[in-house]
């Protein structure tokens, strides 16, 4: 992970696939949310997802996925991250935009 950028990779199993043997949509969204969160928090602050818009272009039966998140805009409280997910042949499978809300510094512990 570097400033304003994060990469999440996953090797797929039968648990990540649908009945047709292709990747389950929830797997794509989970990876995308992790990549968006990683890119957002690369500035040392903690973020939560408040919204996303996601598009599925094609599916795959390959065994490895790479999600890449890049910050497009960062303000005091909001961070907008674009995410793309590709397979190991670098074919674009899906992507989206995530809006993240800053909830504080990474090292803080919530008070009761």
Where is each model-derived feature located?
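Short glycine- and Lys/Arg-enriched binding-loop motifs that mark or flank ligand-binding interfaces
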Residues: 17, 21-22, 33, 65, ...
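Compact, glycine-rich, soluble single-domain proteins
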Residues: 20-41, 49
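Catalytic strand-loop segment that frames the active site of acyl-thioester-processing enzymes
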Residues: 1-21
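Hydrophobic beta-strand-centered segment that forms part of the acyl-chain substrate-binding groove
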Residues: 37-66, 71
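HotDog/MaoC-like acyl-thioester-processing domains
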Residues: 60-62, 66-68, 72-112
């Amino acid at each position: 992970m570097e400033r304003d950028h994060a990469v999440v990779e996953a090797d797929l199993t039968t648990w990540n696939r649908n009945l047709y043997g292709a990747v389950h949509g929830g797997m794509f969204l989970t990876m995308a949310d992790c990549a968006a969160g990683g890119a957002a928090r690369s500035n040392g602050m903690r973020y939560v997802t408040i919204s996303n818009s996601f598009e599925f272009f094609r599916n795959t039966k390959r065994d490895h996925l790479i999600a890449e998140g890049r910050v497009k805009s960062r303000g005091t409280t909001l961070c907008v991250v674009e995410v793309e997910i590709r397979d190991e042949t670098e074919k674009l499978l899906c992507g989206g935009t995530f809006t993240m809300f800053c909830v504080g510094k990474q090292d803080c512990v919530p008070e009761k």
